[in-house]
């Protein structure tokens, strides 16, 4: 990895402490996970690059497919149960595991291939697949885009950014079920567009890009799951209610509470003290929301253009910058990506260690 000070293509003055940890021309990474001195990155197939789906960073710009080459070698006709079709998120748990969220669809907005949507846990001690959790057709629906994951006890919670809803996964039994399907709390609202470089991000048909249930965090005490569409606002619900399959859909919906009115965010990370770090897309900034609701800017810089899912590790916050809005999909087939793709890290206060 490199450790150089950040410098933007528009020659903006780089903030003190913002370090380029790695850069590449082979991947458009939107996710990062850190295990000691090992740094993993991942990116979606629909971004249109030929690098691995998940990689271990080796040196300044080397990328080693992880956990091996075969899992990163999906092609049409491949066994979708033993390859990564489209990785949208990676997440390190508290038990030496690296979780991989595979949407199962090689195209943006497409339906998951049969049997392809899954959550995969890799044992970081052995670098081998520990367990595969299939997300079957009753969970990953046509149009689903299983987005991200968080944990509490024997359960995991996932967001579906395509077919608005949450997924509750029993880590012991492997059973998964959908909750809050189509509820307002998980549905992208109108009137809160994603704005980058002063313009609304639009789909090829000209309609504004709308991303349903996307970011989520579990409170440090495990009591609440915080969640929302990418556009905001955020809601919360008690995890004990989500964990109970006997709770009715109407009772769950009635227990959703408003939590925080945040702008469109690329990604979030929650510190042990309850501080929520989030990337403010429109302002190319990393901000934080204190437990009392106060919001302040941590660092702002043009190079932080669409920072996606950050990670807290070793006193740093790691910031992958995929520049998703600059992909050809959103510009009539023309790429606006400014190469190389970068991963930054920024030193935080002690409470984020």
Feature roles, as predicted:
Residues 172-176, 237-248, 348-352:
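Short loop/turn segments immediately following beta-strands, especially the blade-tip
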Residues 60-99, 103-107, 112, 131-139:
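Blade-loop segments of beta-propeller domains
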Residues 63-73, 130-134, 177-192, 244-260, ...:
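Beta-propeller fold detector
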Residues 41-48, 100-104, 111, 158-162, ...:
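Conserved beta-strand positions in repeat-built beta-propeller and related beta-rich domains
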Residues 25-36, 78-97, 101, 138-157, ...:
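Beta-rich, blade/repeat-based domains predominating
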Residues 106-155, 159:
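Asp-box/WD-like beta-propeller blade repeats and closely related beta-sheet repeat scaffolds
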Residues 40-73, 109-111, 124-125:
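Beta-propeller domains
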Residues 19-52:
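Beta-strand-rich domains and repeat architectures in extracellular enzymes and scaffolds
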């Amino acid at each position: 990895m490199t450790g150089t000070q950040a410098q933007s293509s528009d020659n903006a003055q780089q903030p003190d402490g913002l370090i380029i940890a790695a850069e590449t021309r082979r991947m458009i990474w939107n996710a990062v996970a850190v295990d000691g001195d090992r740094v993993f990155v991942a990116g979606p197939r629909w971004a249109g690059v030929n690098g691995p789906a998940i990689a271990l960073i080796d040196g300044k710009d080397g990328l080693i497919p992880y956990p091996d080459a075969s899992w990163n070698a999906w092609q049409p006709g491949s066994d979708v149960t033993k390859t990564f079709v489209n990785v949208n998120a990676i997440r390190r748990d508290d038990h030496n595991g690296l979780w991989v969220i595979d949407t199962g669809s090689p195209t943006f907005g497409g339906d998951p291939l049969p049997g392809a949507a899954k959550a995969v846990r890799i044992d970081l001690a052995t670098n081998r697949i520990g367990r595969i959790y299939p997300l079957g057709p009753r969970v990953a629906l046509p149009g689903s885009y299983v987005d991200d994951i968080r944990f509490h006890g024997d359960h995991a919670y996932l967001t579906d950014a395509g077919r608005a809803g949450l997924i509750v996964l029993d880590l012991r039994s492997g059973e998964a079920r959908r909750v809050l399907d189509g509820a307002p709390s998980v549905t992208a609202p109108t009137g809160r567009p994603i704005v980058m470089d002063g313009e609304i991000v639009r789909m090829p048909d000209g309609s504004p890009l709308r991303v349903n249930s996307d970011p989520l965090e579990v409170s440090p005490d495990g009591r609440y799951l915080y969640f929302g569409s990418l556009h905001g606002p955020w809601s919360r619900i008690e995890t004990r209610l989500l964990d109970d399959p006997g709770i009715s859909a109407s009772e769950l919906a009635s227990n959703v509470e408003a939590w925080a009115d945040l702008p469109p965010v690329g990604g979030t990370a929650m510190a042990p003290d309850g501080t929520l770090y989030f990337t403010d897309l429109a302002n190319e900034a990393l901000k934080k929301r204190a437990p009392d609701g106060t919001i302040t800017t941590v660092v702002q810089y043009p190079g932080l253009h669409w920072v996606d899912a950050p990670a807290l590790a070793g006193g740093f916050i790691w910031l992958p910058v995929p520049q998703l809005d600059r992909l050809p999909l959103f510009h009539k087939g023309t790429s606006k990506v400014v190469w190389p793709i970068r991963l930054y890290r920024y030193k935080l206060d002690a409470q984020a260690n």
